[in-house]
C-alpha cells in the first residue's frame, strides 16, 4: 500500500466516523442500500422523472418497521388555470396497496422492512405476516412471516404514468392462496380549473386474480398511476417493459457514458446519481424538449439560470441526445426574444413555450444565457449548432456591454435569487458570467470565421472587465481579502466563489479561506450569507468547482467528499438539493448538473477552446495516485482522460479517443495542456 493510498483510506475512515450515515454503497454494486435496523422511524422524499410525468415519493419506515408512502403525481402536459409557471396538474395519492391483498383469506399484517435500495428506482423489500384466525389461543402467538414483498417504484420513460411492481414470495413452509383484487381509484378534476377541461387521475391494479403460491415461489402484479384528459382512454402499459426501458436508460445510457473512476467510491457514486437526475428530468412538451428543474413547481418551462447557465453546458459531455436537444431548444426559445432595442430577455419561458415570466426584472439573464450558450456550442462540437447560436451569443454580449456602469461592471435589477437576498445595482455573479461568456466567445468566433476585429474586441472587453471586477468588488470582508457581492455589502456571501470559476485568481487565497471558514461553511455546505441559516446547494457546487480551478485540490476534495457523503448516504438521499428552508431540500435537477461540472470542469479542468479542442488542467488531490473520466462525449467525440502521478511528482495524462492512438502528455500539477482531438 502506498503512502497516498493509506492517507486516502484513513481520511475516508475518519470522515465516515464523524457522523452516522444511514445508507451504504452496496459492495460490488452501483446502488445504495439502507439495511433497516433500530434507526427508525425515518422519513424521506425523492423525485423521479420521465418525459411526460414526474413524481415526488414521500416515504418512510415507521417505529414498527412498516413502510409508508405518499405519491405526489405531476403531469406537466395537463395544464391548469391560470396557465403559469406552476400550472402542471398535480395530485397526491396515498393508496395502501398491500392492505388490499389477501393471503389465505386473511389480511397482511406486521410488516417489517428489511432493506430499501435506490438505483434508478426505489425498491423496498419487507416481510409480512397474516392476521390471526381467532382471538382465543392465538391471542399471544407471535406473527410468523409468510410473505416477502418486493415493491419497485419508478416513472415511465415516455408515458404519463408512475409504475409500482410488486413481487410476492412465499417464505413459509406451506402453500398460500393469494388474492389480488380488482381495484381502481378514479378522480375527475373541476373542468373550470383545466386549460382543456376536466382531467382524470387514476390508480389501477393490474394482474388481479386468485393464485396458489407454493413455498419459495413468486408472483407479480402491478399498480399504475396516471392521468389523462376527460374522455380519453386510460393507458394499459406493460409494466415489465416500462421497467426494462427505465433500466436501459439508467444502465445503458447514463452508466455507459462519462464514467468517473477515482480512489473515492463516494464521489464516484454520487457523480453517477447526479448524471441520472440531471438527465432524467426532461419533458417532451409541444414546444420541444424542455429540461425541468422539478420540485413540484418547475416543469414544461426553461430558465436562464437552471437551463442556460447550469445544466446545458454539461449535456455535451454526457452525450445524451435528448439532453443536447433540450439544451439547443432552450436557446432557440430565448433567441425568439432578441430585439433591436436591447430590452431584457425574459428570465423564464413557461407553459410549454406559450408565455414568459420576468417578475424579478433583469436578473443578469443575458449574462447567464451568453455564458451557457457559448460553452455549450464549443463543447457540443457541432458547427451547425454553433452557427445557429452565435447570433444569440452576440446579442447577449452586446446587451451586457450596454449595461456597464461607470465602474465598468454589469448592472442588473437583481440576481438568480430574485431578491431573497440583497444584490445591489450590480452584483458579482452577473459580471463574472459576462466575463466567462467573453472568454468563450473569442475561440467560438474564431471557429466560425468571425472577423478578427470582433474577437479582439471581446478579448479587450474581457481584460477590462477583469480589472473592473477586482476594483469594484474586491476588498476585505469579514477579515478576508475577497469580494463584496455588491457595493455596500459588509457580510460574506457564498457567491464570492464566482471569480474562482472563471480564472480570476488575484484574491483566490482569501476567497477560499472565506468559503471554508466558520462564517459560511456548515455540514450542509455554504450558507448564502454570513450569520444566516439559509443554504442553497448551487453556490456550494460552484464553490467546489472554483476551489479546484485555483489549484487547491486537497481542500476541495475534503469538502467534496463530505458533501457527497451527506447527500448520497445521509438522511436525505441521493441527489444534490435546491435549498433549505425554502422548498424543504427539493431534488431540483439542474443542481445535479452543477455537481457533474465540478468533475468535468473542476477536477479535470476541461475548458473548451474550440469545436474539437480544449484546455486541460487536472486538479488531483495529493492522496490520489490516479483518476479517470471515460467515454466523454463532448466535442463530437468519444474519449477517455486518465491522470496518473509519476514518481517525481509530474502528472502523466493520457487522452484516448475511441479507435485512435492515445496521446500522452506530461505536466506539472496546475499546468494547462492544450488538447486537439483528431478530425
Q: Language-model segments: what does each one mean?
A:
Residues 212-239, 296-300, 346-368, 398-463, ...:
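The feature captures the catalytic groove of carbohydrate-active enzymes
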Residues 10, 19-269, 319-320, 552, ...:
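Terminal accessory carbohydrate-recognition/targeting modules of carbohydrate-active enzymes
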Residues 282-285, 338-343, 401-411, 471-478, ...:
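Proline-centered turn/helix-capping motifs that create local helix->coil transitions or kinks
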Residues 3-7:
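N-terminal export leaders
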Residues 251-387, 414-417, 488-501, 527-561:
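Substrate-binding groove/exosite segments of carbohydrate-active enzymes
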Residues 303-328, 332, 391-394, 398, ...:
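Active-site core of glycosidic bond-cleaving carbohydrate-active enzymes
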Residues 166, 264-273, 456-475:
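Gly/Pro-rich turn-and-neighbor structural signature
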Amino acid at each position: 500500500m502506498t503512502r497516498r493510498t493509506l492517507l486516502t483510506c484513513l481520511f475516508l475512515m475518519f470522515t465516515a466516523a464523524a457522523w452516522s450515515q444511514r445508507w451504504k454503497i452496496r459492495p460490488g454494486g452501483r446502488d445504495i442500500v439502507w439495511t433497516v435496523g433500530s434507526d427508525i422511524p425515518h422519513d424521506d422524499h425523492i423525485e423521479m422523472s420521465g418525459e411526460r410525468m414526474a413524481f415526488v415519493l414521500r416515504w418512510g419506515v415507521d417505529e414498527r418497521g412498516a413502510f409508508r408512502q405518499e405519491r405526489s403525481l405531476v403531469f406537466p402536459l395537463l395544464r391548469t388555470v391560470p396557465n403559469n409557471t406552476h400550472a402542471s396538474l398535480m395530485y397526491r395519492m396515498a393508496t395502501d396497496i398491500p392492505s388490499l391483498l389477501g393471503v389465505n383469506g386473511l389480511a397482511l399484517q406486521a410488516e417489517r422492512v428489511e432493506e430499501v435500495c435506490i438505483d434508478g428506482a426505489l425498491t423496498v423489500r419487507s416481510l409480512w405476516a397474516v392476521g390471526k384466525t381467532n382471538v382465543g389461543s392465538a391471542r399471544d402467538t407471535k406473527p410468523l412471516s409468510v410473505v416477502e414483498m418486493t415493491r419497485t417504484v419508478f416513472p415511465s420513460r415516455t408515458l404519463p404514468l408512475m409504475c409500482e411492481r410488486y413481487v410476492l414470495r412465499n417464505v413459509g413452509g406451506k402453500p398460500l392462496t393469494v388474492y389480488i383484487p380488482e381495484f381502481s381509484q378514479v378522480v375527475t378534476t373541476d373542468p373550470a380549473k383545466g386549460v382543456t377541461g376536466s382531467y382524470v387521475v387514476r390508480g389501477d391494479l393490474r394482474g388481479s386474480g386468485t393464485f396458489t403460491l407454493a413455498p419459495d415461489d413468486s408472483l407479480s402484479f402491478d399498480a399504475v398511476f396516471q392521468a389523462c384528459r376527460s374522455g380519453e382512454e386510460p393507458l394499459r402499459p406493460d409494466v415489465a417493459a416500462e421497467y426494462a426501458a427505465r433500466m436501459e436508460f439508467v444502465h445503458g445510457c447514463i452508466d455507459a457514458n462519462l464514467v468517473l473512476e477515482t480512489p473515492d467510491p463516494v464521489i464516484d457514486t454520487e457523480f453517477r446519481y447526479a448524471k441520472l437526475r440531471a438527465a432524467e428530468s426532461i419533458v417532451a412538451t409541444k414546444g420541444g424538449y424542455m429540461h425541468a428543474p422539478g420540485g413540484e413547481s418547475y416543469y414544461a418551462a426553461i430558465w436562464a439560470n437552471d437551463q442556460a447557465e447550469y445544466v446545458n453546458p454539461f449535456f455535451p459531455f454526457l452525450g445524451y441526445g435528448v439532453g443536447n436537444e433540450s439544451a439547443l431548444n432552450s436557446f432557440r426559445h430565448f433567441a425568439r426574444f432578441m430585439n433591436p432595442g436591447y430590452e431584457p430577455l425574459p428570465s423564464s419561458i413557461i407553459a410549454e413555450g406559450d408565455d414568459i415570466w420576468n417578475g424579478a426584472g433583469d436578473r443578469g439573464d443575458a449574462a447567464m444565457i451568453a455564458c451557457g450558450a457559448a460553452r455549450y456550442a464549443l463543447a457540443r462540437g457541432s458547427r451547425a449548432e454553433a452557427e445557429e447560436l452565435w447570433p444569440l451569443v452576440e446579442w447577449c454580449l452586446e446587451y451586457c456591454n450596454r449595461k456597464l456602469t461607470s465602474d465598468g461592471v454589469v448592472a442588473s435589477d437583481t440576481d438568480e435569487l430574485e431578491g431573497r437576498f440583497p444584490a445591489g445595482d450590480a452584483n458579482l455573479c452577473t459580471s463574472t458570467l459576462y466575463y466567462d461568456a467573453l472568454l468563450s466567445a473569442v475561440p467560438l468566433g474564431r471557429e466560425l470565421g468571425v472577423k478578427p476585429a470582433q474577437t479582439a474586441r471581446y478579448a479587450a472587453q474581457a481584460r477590462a472587465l477583469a480589472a473592473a471586477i477586482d476594483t469594484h468588488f474586491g476588498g476585505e470582508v469579514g477579515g478576508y481579502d475577497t469580494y463584496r457581492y455588491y457595493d455596500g455589502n459588509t457580510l460574506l456571501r457564498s457567491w464570492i466563489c464566482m471569480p474562482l470559476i472563471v480564472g480570476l485568481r488575484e484574491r483566490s487565497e482569501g476567497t477560499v479561506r472565506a468559503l471554508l471558514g466558520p462564517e459560511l461553511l456548515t455540514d450542509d455546505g455554504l450558507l448564502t450569507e454570513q450569520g444566516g441559516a439559509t443554504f442553497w446547494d448551487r453556490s456550494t457546487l460552484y464553490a467546489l468547482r472554483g476551489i479546484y480551478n485555483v489549484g487547491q485540490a486537497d481542500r476541495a476534495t475534503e469538502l467534496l467528499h463530505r458533501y457527497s457523503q451527506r447527500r448520497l448516504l445521509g438522511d436525505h438521499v441521493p441527489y444534490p438539493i435546491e435549498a433549505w428552508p425554502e422548498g424543504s431540500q427539493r431534488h431540483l435537477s439542474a443542481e445535479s448538473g452543477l455537481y457533474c461540472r465540478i468533475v468535468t470542469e473542476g477536477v479535470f479542468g476541461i475548458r473548451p477552446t474550440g469545436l474539437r479542442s480544449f484546455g486541460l488542467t487536472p486538479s488531483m488531490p495529493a492522496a490520489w495516485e490516479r483518476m479517470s473520466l471515460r467515454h466523454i462525449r463532448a466535442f463530437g467525440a468519444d474519449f477517455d482522460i486518465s491522470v496518473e502521478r509519476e514518481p517525481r511528482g509530474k502528472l502523466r495524462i493520457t487522452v484516448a479517443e475511441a479507435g485512435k492512438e492515445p496521446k500522452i502528455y506530461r505536466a506539472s500539477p496546475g499546468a494547462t495542456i492544450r488538447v486537439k482531438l483528431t478530425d
